């Protein structure tokens, strides 16, 4: 890819904003819902300027009622629209747990109905958010059939995965890490692109140990790989990117090569994503 085909460097949060803007221009069925996303531009300013550009019917400020927001979005999705909900902080996604797991996730199995809904969930610690604004709740949804879950680690993936999620006919939980918002940058392609859901990526090849991770922990893994490389230990870093559907083939291929694996995630050890992958590796 030549520099002529790249944009100026953008941050992780700007990549998310770009994806929303481009998809709203591309498809008039796409609209946004969330607390303070209109006039205020969102808690993290992802949608700043969107209200003026697209109007109040496509950028909907909502009451503080996560269950109500998601319920309304599900109804809109079932009527043919493509809502993107901003959950101001992922911690409060639990308030909409029933709507997500019992309605959005199960519609395909109950009626064969598509629910093209995206829920953006800013998650993770490292930003002085305290116990109520720093959680990683992705594990709560990991065993809910009917959902797709993504967790990008780079601006490129943040934009490409969000565009893919918006175009998908299924409900997608899009976990964006707050710590990465303005700490990392990358030059993105000028042309339209998506990152396919369900495809992991080897961010660093290695021969000794497979380190499997996602989100902000990818950067910690790459730092660790550089340090261990000086001691002669060659780490392979696998970025899951999509948690559901899980790219088992990429995981298995890496572990077959190295015969050793480390699972790294920012979450509870018990019942987390890492525990499930560990079980899969043990079984297979």
Tell me the role of every PLM-derived stretch:
Residues 1-175, 180, ...:
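Thiamine diphosphate
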